[in-house]
Amino acid sequence: MTNNVALVAGARGIVGSQLVKTLLHRGWEVIGLSRNASSHPQNIPLVTVDLLDAKHTARALQPLSKVTHIFYSAWINAENWTEMVEPNVTMLRNLVCHTAMISSLKTVSLIQGYKVYGAHLGPFKTPARESDPGVAGAEFNAAQLAWLSDYQRGRAWHWNAIRPGVVGSALSGNTMNLALSIALYASLCKSLNLPLRFPGSEQTWRSIVDYTEAGLLAEATVWAATSSAAENQAFNVNNGDVWRWSELWPLIARWFGLECAPPVRLSFQQMFKDYQPAWRELARRHRLVETDILQVNDGQFADFVFSWDYDMFGDGSKLRRAGFWRMQATDDMFFTLFKQFRAARIIP
């Protein structure tokens, strides 16, 4: 056991859920935060809190004086990028300010992404590096870090910012799970005797993307939270390799025993809606755990990823130079996730 006590905001998400597992495995005490009262799959204590409400946050956090580390992977959506800034900065500010006042806080780990490099706006400089200049315009990840780094100045605790690529996870029911969307699509294609057609444009087919396995991301995040080399630093965290879809997609098709077909723009959201009856029959026939495909994954994030008709990757060497060495072959990551989906009877 360690004396470290983690407070995880976003503990049920694609990043937070794996982070909880990793922390528990390392002997940490872990407390989760949630807007709604419910249980957590890992049976950790959950504190129900509305981080947008400063007074409610102060009351809810009052008993948590033993917290040593905050891991922040929560976020709230809005109509556009501009409207996402204020609520997301407010949530982080309320959590950090109140926790810092009542505890012996050591580190705040902020999960970000490549949006800080302008990845959401269109083609951007690749490989993206942590030293790249900021991008003009409203973006909540950058605004959060600007507030956090300013607030931390002169205080005894430290921050770090973690920037993964597309995260690979076995978590079901999360819209951000690209591997799961692909697995559902491939399962439908197999049942309908269709090839696995690439669902993006020719430009997307040729673009370079990097990925981050959820376990590697969790380990890197814990390393950064406990390493002096990571104090007040941002790190890109990726598997350590890069792929073009034109290389990776045929391997995925082969894993499912399917022919690979040329690119045609397809919407996963629309496809999953159209094939709800087909999935119900497939789930019944193979005794899958969920008969409603939209409850497994809605395809929204997959549509976002396959709309990228430009390169999307970062330089992960700063993390390795600082002392975190683990790497992961991305093709093996996908194959392992597909096996896990199958073992859990999410796909046939």
What is each PLM-predicted segment?
Residues 4-26:
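N-terminal Rossmann NAD(P)H-binding glycine-rich loop of SDR-like oxidoreductase domains
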Residues 38-42, 48-94:
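NAD(P)H-binding glycine-rich loop region in Rossmannoid oxidoreductase-like domains
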Residues 70-72, 82, 90-140, 160:
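Conserved Rossmann-fold NAD(P)-dependent oxidoreductase catalytic core, especially the SDR/UDP-sugar
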Residues 112, 147-176:
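Conserved beta-loop-beta element that borders a ligand/cofactor-binding pocket
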Residues 218-302, 315-317, 321, 338, ...:
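Mid/C-terminal beta-alpha module of Rossmann-like enzyme folds, strongest
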